[in-house]
């Protein structure tokens, strides 16, 4: 699968923002390459449940665009750009990669349910008006057009964009700007601990 950030990197963030993020990145990661362990520490994501840990690993892999096992500064900026300023289509492509845990190009019900549960463990701003199971059932009922129990990228992109409720819910559940803003305010030590470490209730 191609780089979802093609043509989108540093230019999406202002020079001031880039300087601030570069300073923070190099202060906390002097090697210039962020490992998965450092990624967890950097974002304050520690003492997580197994499902939440799997989600963090999947998020790391989607941001590691060249698949070398590290996130360098350019990948880091591209990720921030996507999270903070990405267009709907870009974000949906990234959401799809995040949900497609086994990387086979389709999302099945178990993959979606696993990630939704994990997201709710980590992200206290995510929508909780429906249980994870109810939300997963709703997604498949609305956008699994051919009824094969799997969502292709095309089904996912078209279906979500046509359904404002799904689009709004997915956007809220995967809104990492709260974590990013806390990082900007130097509060990352507290993020992802305490009650967020509890296993998500379906």
Swiss-Prot record:
Residues 31-49, 51-86, 87-122, 131-166 form the EF-hand domain. It is found in: Membrane; Photoreceptor inner segment; Cell projection, Cilium, Photoreceptor outer segment. SUPFAM superfamilies: EF-hand (SSF47473). Ca(2+) 3 binds at residues 144, 146, 148, 150, 155. The modification Deamidated asparagine is found at residue 3. Disruption phenotype: Guca1a and Guca1b double knockout mice show an increase in response to light in dark-adapted cone photoreceptors. Dark-adapted cone photoreceptors show a delayed response time and a delayed recovery time in response to light. Guca1a, Guca1b and Rcvrn triple knockout mice show rod photoreceptors have a reduced current decay during light response. The keyword ATP-binding does not apply. In the retina, expressed in rod photoreceptors (at protein level). Expressed in cone photoreceptors. It is a lipid-anchor. Ca(2+) 2 binds at residues 100, 102, 104, 106, 111. The keyword Transmembrane does not apply. GO terms for biological process: cellular response to calcium ion; phototransduction; positive regulation of cGMP-mediated signaling; visual perception. Ca(2+) 1 binds at residues 64, 66, 68, 70, 75. Keywords: Calcium, Cell projection, Lipoprotein, Membrane, Metal-binding, Myristate, Repeat, Sensory transduction, Vision. A lipid is attached at residue 2 (N-myristoyl glycine). One of its GO terms (cellular component) is cone photoreceptor outer segment. GO terms for molecular function: calcium ion binding; calcium sensitive guanylate cyclase activator activity; guanylate cyclase regulator activity. Homodimer. Stimulates retinal guanylyl cyclase when free calcium ions concentration is low and inhibits guanylyl cyclase when free calcium ions concentration is elevated. This Ca(2+)-sensitive regulation of retinal guanylyl cyclase is a key event in recovery of the dark state of rod photoreceptors following light exposure. May be involved in cone photoreceptor light response and recovery of response in bright light. Binds three calcium ions (via EF-hands 2, 3 and 4) when calcium levels are high. Binds Mg(2+) when calcium levels are low. This is Guanylyl cyclase-activating protein 1. It comes from Mus musculus (Mouse). The gene is Guca1a.
């Amino acid at each position: 699968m191609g780089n979802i950030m093609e043509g989108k990197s540093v230019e999406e963030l202002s020079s001031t923002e880039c300087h601030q993020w570069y300073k923070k990145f190099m202060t906390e990661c002097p090697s210039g390459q962020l490992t998965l362990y450092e990624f967890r520490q950097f974002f304050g994501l520690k003492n997580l449940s197994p499902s939440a840990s799997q989600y963090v690993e999947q998020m790391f892999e989607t941001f590691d665009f060249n698949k070398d096992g590290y996130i360098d500064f350019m990948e880091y900026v591209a990720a921030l750009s996507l999270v903070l300023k990405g267009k709907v289509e870009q974000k949906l492509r990234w959401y799809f990669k995040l949900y497609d845990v086994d990387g086979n190009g389709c999302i099945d019900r178990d993959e979606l349910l696993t990630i939704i549960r994990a997201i709710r463990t980590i992200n206290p701003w995510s929508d909780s008006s429906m249980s994870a199971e109810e939300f997963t059932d709703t997604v498949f009922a609305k956008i699994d057009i051919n009824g094969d129990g799997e969502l292709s990228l095309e089904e996912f992109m078209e279906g979500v964009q046509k359904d404002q409720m799904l689009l709004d819910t997915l956007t809220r559940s995967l809104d990492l700007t709260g974590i990013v803003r806390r990082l900007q305010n130097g509060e990352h030590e507290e993020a992802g601990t305490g009650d967020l470490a509890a296993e998500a209730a379906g």
